[in-house]
Amino acid sequence: ACSMRNGWPPTMSDSFSELLASRTVSVVGLGVSGRAVAKVAARRGAKVIAFDAKAGAGEALSKELDNVSVFTDADPEALADKIRTHARDLLVISPGIAPTSALYQAASVAPVEMISEVELAWRLHAVGPNAASPWLTITGTDGKTTTVNMLASILQAQGLNAPAVGNVGKPIIQVVDEGGYDALAVELSSFQLHLTKSVEPLASICLNLAADHLNW
């Protein structure tokens, strides 16, 4: 379900600085991409509510940023209850959390829009100062990292600021927030694509498909 509370979801008329301001962003999973989402959202004026199974997860974040609250619980069902109770506006879930898990199921029934870090990064990119800088995306079962690094090297050899991001390098949302890029070479796993809805790359490649990661 998608909540319209507090002006969410945004329209394309929202500016780069206004997209997250005064809204609540819920983050499930404080891994590398989850921490990046929390930092970017909080620094852009959002209230951040984060959830993680590990005790102490996000402690540094909540100390660094006043508008970040963190709920932790090693019991998946108890943490799922916290998500259902406290999640608001927009929810960004870790790509490592499977759709069959209690946490994903709790997030999916909360009165929020659930998206990936990649999707949020695209929405920021689309209204930001680098909106004209293309994304070149690569997915597939095998060879993604090698190919995306080759792509970034080709672009950089032409003098472009074109980092490899996504499932390799820095989280995409961090790079979009920092800005200054001419193009992005983006590695996307199937997990990252699962809740990615509106990304429009200039070009994309699916390298291959094979039976892998079937326990997700």
Model feature map: region roles:
Residues 5-6, 197:
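Generic N-terminal simple sequence motifs
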Residues 6-116, 120:
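N-terminal leader/targeting and accessory segments in enzymes
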